[in-house]
Regions:
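Active-site C-terminal subdomain of aminotransferase-like
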Residues: 43-46, 53, 58-167, 172-179, ...
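Active-site phosphate-binding strand-loop segment of PLP-dependent enzymes
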Residues: 1-48
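Alpha-helix termini
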Residues: 2-12, 72, 156-157, 178-179, ...
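A common structural junction motif
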Residues: 112, 212-217, 261-270
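Conserved strand-to-helix beginnings and helix N-cap segments that scaffold or border functional pockets
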Residues: 29-34, 59-62, 94, 238, ...
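Alpha-helical scaffolding segments of alpha/beta enzyme cores, especially the outer helices
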Residues: 31-38, 78, 99, 144, ...
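Short, small-residue-enriched loops and turns at beta-alpha junctions
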Residues: 22-27, 54-56, 111-112, 227
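Conserved PLP-binding catalytic core of the aspartate aminotransferase-like
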Residues: 140-150, 158-217, 221-223, 228-241, ...
Length: 271
């Protein structure tokens, strides 16, 4: 498509940006950064990488997708992220050249409207980063707990896990039944699609409540309809349970929690 567009315009495609999440919140998949960087260099695009769900999470030292996939951070023009995820504070970050960072800073809400977040929250982000830098065992434990959770749920034939193996954010969907196979027809009928989505949510709600009654909190992934209907016509748009592995639990505690989630799923769906 890009080749055709460039040939038709007979000149380089300028002012084009590739914008992507590193770890996608919607389905837990991880983007293949080396391929995107290759595409960026080939067409001379600029790139913005959102590391909200990967900074402080992915990589041996928590430095995100560039570390996990061994990509030079200088190959990414702008790296941004939300500090409310792994760092449990507020605000965000922008990593780039001095010129770009300065532009972002002077055009940010905190500068334009003098609405900076409390100093305590900013300091909390710094402390969180220092803690992660000082204790790399956190990442080892997170990877182990992610593996424990995934291995506990993967054998259940009634579900499918959409997330990448390295992702501690697991999205669990109901495996499509024979009645669901013709999804193209289902998507073409708004009423039938809405009814199908509601029935899926109801089943997931039962699993959610069973786990909660046994002391494990999981949640259904909130779904906001897209302004373009075709964007809701893929595996990522189907209702799912959102389950997050955490380094705050010991491996034994993670196994116990995973067993409860597995038992809740099997109780509702069967093995």
């Amino acid at each position: 498509h890009l080749n055709e567009e460039q040939e038709s315009s007979r000149q380089p495609l300028t002012r084009r940006f590739i914008v992507t999440e590193a770890l996608f919140e919607r389905d837990g998949t991880i983007t293949h950064l080396p391929q995107i960087v290759e595409l960026k260099k080939k067409y001379k695009f600029r790139m913005v990488l959102d590391e909200s769900y990967s900074a402080g999470i992915l990589g041996n030292t928590g430095r995100g997708l560039t570390e996990l996939q061994n990509v030079d951070p200088d190959d990414v023009d702008i790296i941004v992220g939300n500090l409310a995820i792994a760092f449990s504070t507020a605000g965000g970050f922008c990593a780039s050249t001095k010129e770009i960072v300065k532009h972002q800073r002077i055009n940010g809400l905190s500068f334009v409207f003098s609405a900076a977040m409390p100093v305590m929250m900013a300091n909390g982000s710094t402390v969180a980063m220092d803690l992660l830098d000082g204790d790399l065992s956190v990442f080892e434990r997170l990877r182990e707990n992610t593996s424990i959770l995934r291995n506990a749920l993967a054998p259940i034939s009634a579900i499918t896990i959409t997330s990448s193996p390295e992702s501690p954010l697991l999205h669990v969907q109901l495996r499509p039944s024979e009645d669901d196979t013709n999804l193209a027809v289902l998507y073409s009928d708004p009423k039938a699609h809405a009814s199908w989505m509601a029935s899926q949510q109801e089943v997931l709600k039962k699993i959610e409540r069973l786990a909660l009654n046994q002391g494990v909190w999981i949640s259904r992934n909130p779904h906001i309809p897209s302004i373009r209907a075709e964007l809701d016509q893929g595996p990522w748009a189907r209702p799912s349970l959102r389950i997050i592995a955490t380094s705050a639990l010991s491996p034994a505690e993670m196994r116990q929690a995973a067993d409860i989630v597995r038992a809740s799923i099997v109780s509702v769906l069967g093995s």
